[in-house]
A protein has these predicted regions:
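Feature captures the catalytic cores and cofactor-binding loops of soluble hydro-lyases/lyases
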Residues: 18-23, 30-74, 78-82, 87-97, ...
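Active-site loops and adjacent core secondary-structure elements that bind or stabilize anionic groups
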Residues: 152, 156-160, 164-328, 332-360
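A short, charged helix-loop
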Residues: 102-125, 129-168, 229, 368
Length: 370
C-alpha cells in the first residue's frame, strides 16, 4: 500500500454543481490543476480558475450528442495507471498521458427521470456511461486516486481538505472508493429494476438512506432502517421511532390502505386488535376501541381521516405509542401532544410500490472454526 498522496490534477465532470464551488476554490488554493468537460468546465472558469478541456487532452470532441466525452485512453490511462508499477509509468510517459489524482463526478438522474413519468427515450438518455466508468476506474485504483462519486461525499471531502489540504491517506481513499462502489451498485440496481418492471426475474434492492434506530427487536440488538422515512411521514411530536414501532407502523399502513371509507385501526404486535369504518372519525375510533379495549393499551393507532378535536379528546384517554393520520386539526394536535414521548405522524400521500418483498427464513454464514 502507498503512503500519503498529494492531489496535483483533478478531473471534474458533474451533473449537479451545487456545493462544488467551495471544493474547487480550496483545490485551486492548493495548486491543483483542473480537467473538465462542457458545462462543468464553464462552471470552473466562471469561478475565475483555469481549466483544461478534456477535448484538448484527447484531441477528440464530445460526440454522439454528448454520449461520448471522457471515454478515451488518455483519460482512463491517467486514472488507472499504478504509480508504483514501472511498466505503467513508462507507458503513460510514452503516450503523454497525465496522471489524474482526483476524480469528482456524479451520474445522470436516472431514478428522478423515471419518477417524473418521462417517456422511455428520455429515460434511456439518463443511463450514464462515462460517469459510471470514471467512478469504477477511480475507485478500483484507490491506492493512487481519490474518487468523489456524489454530492453526499462533498462534505467529508471538504472537511478533509480543510484539515490537511490536498493530501490523502490510503484509509481516506479506500473509504471514498467504498462509497463510490455503493453509488455505482445502487445506480445499476435502479436501471435493472426499471427494465425488469413487474417480472420479478431477480431481486435487486438498494437503499442509500440509513437510519440508526434506538435498538433492534430487543435492547441488546442493533437496528437500522434503510429507506427514506421522511418521504412517507412527517413526525411532528414524540420520541425517536423504534424498530418495533416500525414493524407496527408497516402493518398499520398495509391494513388501512384496504379501506376507502373513514376508518380507524388499532394494532399491537403487528396485529389488529380493533378496526371500524364509520361516518365520522370519532365514531370509527370509539367502535375500533370497543373491539378490544385491553389490547389497545400501548398500541399503534392509524386512520385515513383528519383527526378533529372531538376524536382527539377520546383518543387521549388511553396510553398509546404511535398515532398516524393524514392530518390533524390544530386543537387535536394540542391535545394529543400533551404526552412528551407520544409519536405523532402525518402520513404523506405516496404511490404504492409496484413490488413488495417479505424476508423469510434468514440464513446466515456458518461459523468458521480454525
Amino acid at each position: 500500500m502507498s503512503e500519503t498522496k498529494r492531489i496535483k490534477t483533478a478531473l471534474v465532470s458533474v451533473y449537479h454543481k451545487e456545493g462544488l464551488d467551495e471544493i474547487i476554490t480550496k483545490l485551486h488554493e492548493e495548486g491543483v490543476e483542473f480537467l473538465s468537460t462542457g458545462g462543468t468546465r464553464q462552471f470552473i472558469e466562471s469561478l475565475g480558475y483555469p481549466c483544461k478541456a478534456v477535448e484538448d487532452l484527447t484531441t477528440y470532441p464530445s460526440i454522439l450528442g454528448g454520449r461520448v466525452k471522457t471515454l478515451h485512453p488518455k483519460v482512463f490511462g491517467g486514472i488507472l495507471c499504478r504509480r508504483g508499477l514501472e511498466q505503467d509509468m513508462q507507458q503513460i510517459e510514452k503516450y503523454e498521458i497525465p496522471e489524474i489524482d482526483l476524480v469528482i463526478v456524479d451520474l445522470y438522474p436516472f431514478e428522478a427521470t423515471v419518477a417524473s413519468g418521462a417517456e422511455e427515450p428520455a429515460i434511456i438518455e439518463k443511463i450514464d456511461i462515462g460517469g459510471i466508468s470514471l467512478i469504477r476506474a477511480a475507485a478500483k485504483n484507490y491506492n493512487d486516486v481519490v474518487i468523489i462519486a456524489s454530492q453526499a461525499q462533498y462534505q467529508p471531502f471538504r472537511d478533509m481538505l480543510m484539515e490537511h489540504g490536498a493530501t490523502t491517506t490510503i484509509e481516506e481513499r479506500r473509504w471514498f472508493a467504498k462509497e463510490a462502489f455503493g453509488v455505482s451498485s445502487h445506480y445499476d440496481s435502479a436501471i435493472f429494476n426499471y427494465f425488469d418492471g413487474e417480472e420479478g426475474s431477480a431481486f435487486r434492492c438498494s437503499a442509500n438512506s440509513q437510519k440508526t434506530l434506538r435498538y433492534g427487536e430487543n435492547p441488546h440488538q442493533k437496528g437500522y432502517f434503510y429507506g427514506n422515512l421522511d418521504a412517507m411521514f412527517d413526525q411532528i411530536h414524540g420520541k425517536e421511532i423504534s424498530y418495533n414501532n416500525l414493524l407496527d407502523i408497516n402493518a398499520a399502513v398495509d391494513l388501512i390502505d384496504e379501506f376507502k371509507d373513514t376508518t380507524f385501526a388499532i394494532l399491537k404486535h403487528n396485529n389488529a386488535c380493533g378496526l371500524a369504518s364509520r361516518p365520522t372519525v370519532l365514531e370509527a375510533w370509539n367502535d375500533a376501541l370497543a373491539g378490544d379495549p385491553v389490547s389497545a393499551f400501548g398500541g399503534v393507532l392509524i386512520t385515513n381521516a383528519v383527526i378533529d378535536k372531538a376524536a382527539a379528546e377520546e383518543i387521549n384517554k388511553i396510553f398509546f405509542e404511535v398515532i398516524i393520520a393524514p392530518d390533524y386539526d390544530v386543537d387535536a394536535l394540542e391535545i394529543l401532544g400533551q404526552k412528551k414521548n407520544r409519536i405523532i405522524l402525518v402520513r404523506k400521500p405516496a404511490a404504492l410500490p409496484k413490488k413488495q418483498f417479505l424476508s423469510l427464513i434468514h440464513i446466515s454464514e456458518p461459523t468458521r472454526h480454525s
